[in-house]
């Protein structure tokens, strides 16, 4: 029978803790970027064309803010997937402890 267990209990627990922290942090960053927080302006990839465009410069900056926010939400979803995988590994390790050899 093929075992789906590929990491030990410590690594699985570490992956679970790190993924929970990553989801919380990236979700908060995504919220702050989509609400156009001024303190995060240094993390927005602005160019000179964005600041001096003929259209409306604030709209191009807001578009970049939203794009970075969406990227944070996508990364948070990836962390949810890794957390689910780590949770499954923790459960498989617990089940392995109770099996009689």
From Swiss-Prot:
InterPro entries: Ribonucl_Kappa, RNase_K
Keywords in alphabetical order: Endonuclease, Hydrolase, Membrane, Nuclease, Transmembrane, Transmembrane helix
Disulfide links within the chain: none
Residue spans crossing the bilayer: 13-33, 68-88
Cellular component GO terms, alphabetical: membrane
A matching Pfam family: V-ATPase_su_f
Enzyme Commission numbers on file: 3.1.-.-
Membrane topology: Multi-pass membrane protein
Any one Gene Ontology molecular-function term assigned to this protein's record: RNA endonuclease activity
Compartments reported by the entry: Membrane
Function: Endoribonuclease which preferentially cleaves ApU and ApG phosphodiester bonds.
Family statement: Belongs to the RNase K family.
Name of the protein described by the UniProt record: Ribonuclease kappa-A
Organism: Danio rerio (Zebrafish)
